[in-house]
Amino acid sequence: MPRKGPVARRDVLPDPIYNSKLVTRLINRIMVDGKRGTAQTILYNAFELVKERSGNDPMEVFDQALKNIMPVLEVKARRVGGSNYQVPIEVKPERRTTLGLRWLVNYARLRGEKTMEERLANEILDAANNAGAAVKKREDTHKMAEANKAFAHYRW
């Protein structure tokens, strides 16, 4: 923790094609070893596949997918009197988006399709239709929070 107060958040620039900061953040999540060009190519090709398969604007499909992935509640471990409790807490909007993007990319990477473009496109389409591994992760997170509702009074 810095002594001079909170560290200022570094803002990302909107991407050149869709003019969206969310897309830039997704590119940053996809990026491996600093290869931004490769990450951009993967994302833009995935968006083209989404456009072909759904017939809708890829940004709308992506926004819907992200809405379906972002968690509202999560559990946080809290130590009380020698035992750990999983305390349900509300997820802040910034973290909600971050978790949604992280889960989308991670579960796209685990899929079986041949190229990352196909994996990402299919995961976005699945998430937009309330299916897929990323949506399941959100459901599991919510179930954990629901199951531990009894410990909600330990919140801090």
Swiss-Prot record:
Protein name: Small ribosomal subunit protein uS7
Native species: Shouchella clausii (strain KSM-K16) (Alkalihalobacillus clausii)
Keywords, alphabetical: Ribonucleoprotein, Ribosomal protein, RNA-binding, rRNA-binding, tRNA-binding
Record gene name: rpsG
GO MF annotations in UniProt: rRNA binding; structural constituent of ribosome; tRNA binding
HAMAP family, per the entry: Ribosomal_uS7_B
Family annotation (InterPro entries): Ribosomal_uS7, Ribosomal_uS7_bac/org-type, Ribosomal_uS7_CS, Ribosomal_uS7_dom, Ribosomal_uS7_dom_sf
Pfam families hit by this protein: Ribosomal_S7 (PF00177)
GO biological process: translation
NCBIfam families referenced in this protein's UniProt entry, alphabetically: rpsG_bact (TIGR01029)
Subunit structure: Part of the 30S ribosomal subunit. Contacts proteins S9 and S11.
